[in-house]
Amino acid sequence: MIRRIEKALLLAVFLIIGVSVSAQEGAYGAYTPYSVFGIGEIAKEGSAYNKSMGGIGIATRNRRFINYTNPAAVTARDSLSFMADFGLEQSNSIYRQGNLKSGNNTFNIHDFVLSFPIYRSSAFMVGITPFSNVGYDFSSVETNQDIIGNTGNITYDSYGTGDIYQVFVGAGATFWKRFSVGAEFIYYFGNIDKITHMDYADNSYRSVNTGSEISVNGATGKFGLQYEQKLAGDVSLTLGATYRMSTRLKGYSTNYRYATQSSVVDTLRHSVDTLAHGNVRFGDEIGVGIALKGGEKWHVEFDYLRSGWGKSGMDTAPGFSAIGDSKFTATTSQSFRLGFEIVPNRNDIRYYMRRCAYRAGVYYDQAYYKLDGNNVNSMGITFGITLPVFRWYNGLTLGVDLGQKASTRHDMIRERYARIVVGFNIHDIWFQKPRYN
């Protein structure tokens, strides 16, 4: 047993190191022009199991999956089992602004979570997952005729990359068989690079590069509770709530501007701004959920989340606030999520597809930033299935998220995407004493 725990923890350490290295290699963890603002696009929390139901999970209790969206949900498990969840995500997007169109594809490891029993109705979990992603690469040309008349044509190339990850350690316990509580310690870390290259068609002018190199870290706590009430037969009602505290970021933002001509580099500006005294922070978040469940046959749930970013400082801090002429205003983000799951007959020994779990969901999200006073909203529909594999609760989860971010109104960029998520759910029975020697 001890060796298994050591191997599992060693695997988690290697994965964390691997993620840290890949984050420094410049590969896109996600790609969207909206990630130019602040810390980029905030990743939707949850495994492939949650994402295939619109992202629900605050009131979900399912002993076959690790539901890390609510720390209290870790107690919904077999008391003798070791559990692991590993997820991958493929995103395919098409962008449109006016008559312009483009597209991009990305592939990324999304989450790795382990869970162990502690004592009777208590359990422990540890994992790593992206918190936000930056990935963009676009060009524009100068349109001001006065500037063009003086200097000639100018091309602006902007690109950025980077990720902020969260490592979390949590535990939960159930009391009176109905009321569960949980708490999580979360540590954030990551690097973000943003660069704009200004190139003059007239070679008598020097090219100018402006950019920021951001390195951040911080810690916070998250708390959750769930209350489950039996109604009639196998039907039960579950109420859930979560709260994540605001996070003061530490680290630095290196902001620079230099001009080049031939092999000559002239530094115009170079400053290092230390993040301190809470001038840049992640917003706090509160979430509530309500779910109805019919044993292991069906589950339906509605979740609402709200996060306050208005005082985050993202829209004023150097390196976070803008690239070129792009500006944004930090605001309150919201998310509405509805999802369901149905399993025809989990114990059917004749028809395999009746043992599979089928899921669907919808969501509506409002981003943590406004552009020129306009909200940036996303909406989508999700589908998914879990295919049972081998014995116990092992399974392969497949999910699809079809959605749209923003619209072409107000000269904004419309993003339509299809995201495919894959989750590997692994169970193993530990701590069970052999009946025979």
What are these regions (language model features)?
Residues 10-18:
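Bacterial N-terminal signal peptides
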Residues 1-10:
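Bacterial N-terminal signal peptides that target proteins for export
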Residues 22-132:
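N-terminal, post-signal peptide beta-strand-biased segments of exported outer-membrane/organellar beta-barrel
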Residues 24-52, 117, 121-437:
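Outer-membrane beta-barrel porins/channels
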